[in-house]
From Swiss-Prot:
The keyword Aminoacyl-tRNA synthetase applies. This is Histidine--tRNA ligase. The keyword ATP-binding applies. PROSITE patterns: AA_TRNA_LIGASE_II. It comes from Haemophilus influenzae (strain 86-028NP). Its main location: cytoplasm. Belongs to the class-II aminoacyl-tRNA synthetase family. The gene is hisS. One of its GO terms (cellular component) is cytoplasm.
Amino acid sequence: MAKTIQAIRGMNDCAPTESPLWQWIEAQVRNVLNSYGYSEVRMPIVESTPLFARAIGEVTDVVSKEMYTFWDNDEQLTLRPEGTAGCVRAAIEHGWIYNNEQRLWYIGPMFRHERPQKGRYRQFHQVGVEVFGIANPEIDAELIMLTYRLWKALGIDQHVTLQLNSIGSLEARANYRSALVGFLENHQDLMSDEEKERLVRNPLRILDTKNPELQKVLDNAPKLLDYLDDESRAHFEQLCSLLDAVGIQYEINPKLVRGLDYYNKTVFEWVTSALGAQGTVCGGGRYDGLVEQLGGHATPSIGFAMGLERLVLLVQEVNPNVPTKSAVDIYVVYQGEGATLVAFELAEKVRSELPHLNTMLHCSGGNFKKQFKRADKSGATLALVIGESEVQNKQVVVKHLQGGTDQQTLDLVNIIDYLQTQF
């Protein structure tokens, strides 16, 4: 027997028993985003490597350690580690944002070569939202309200907490960086080699360290909010006022900086403790300089992304009222001379006349006992039964699989009217 081939570590299959929950979550995402007037876009999963180096920052962990990169002839290409850079590239390339505002969203797989752990994998799926051309804090508030509405639709709103911060302008961050480095240089004995490297290359990333001793030291570190420029401070204060007005609770987290270099002003995360250690469900912020950095006109921008794997785990943990199996409504069984053709015609008629119902046709043979076992296993509400006598009499037997009336016989011409009364 040939040796079987396994999935690559950190890249997982989604089983038939798991996909209904994914589909339900994705449907809630689409419904909420469409209700706010956002438009879906689709980008390639492979981009030119320099796109991410320029957008995310060469000293970030993502670019320096985690990207899947390869050569195609003389061009270096990368499996996308996130969606914002590709969306900005597409917006510039196709002129979507020239003298125009856009509210866009996308969904799809991303790739990072990091240590797989619960809810975080090397191939993972993200929903991303990007807004171009709006500078005021009202759009910051709208994105946060949009995510909160999605949490309510998913039944997880009581299990997530909003954390906010402002990281100001590039100049304000540079001033803060100097103050932070000056403070941390006296505590290098508490740092790992990786943290010492971050102190030199990207010191703001030390603020979200998991090192408990260093976390205690950081409680007394300079606060980024104390170094904000006046414009960023006013922007942040207005955002907080808008959230207060609509009743969205938040915590100001002065250590929140996000992991990518393109952010400025507002940054936010929705976090949860329902999965054990506190983890991020959704994160985003402003990146007003990124469009120009990638060759476009100066364009104020903001966005967020949420990981679907982490979201699936959270919904499973806290919301018992979610679908756990495919929604088959009607299962058609048949046996005997002439029954195959009638059953096929019946199944197609139901699909045509009642397209909102999911109709499964038994195609693997066997006696009625075997077929009804399959029908029960499918979770269908009704079975439509065609045997030799039903073929001769132009009838169909309706069997209730989830309790209620046991079964009844109807003329085939009346079956659609009957099904409309049942669903």
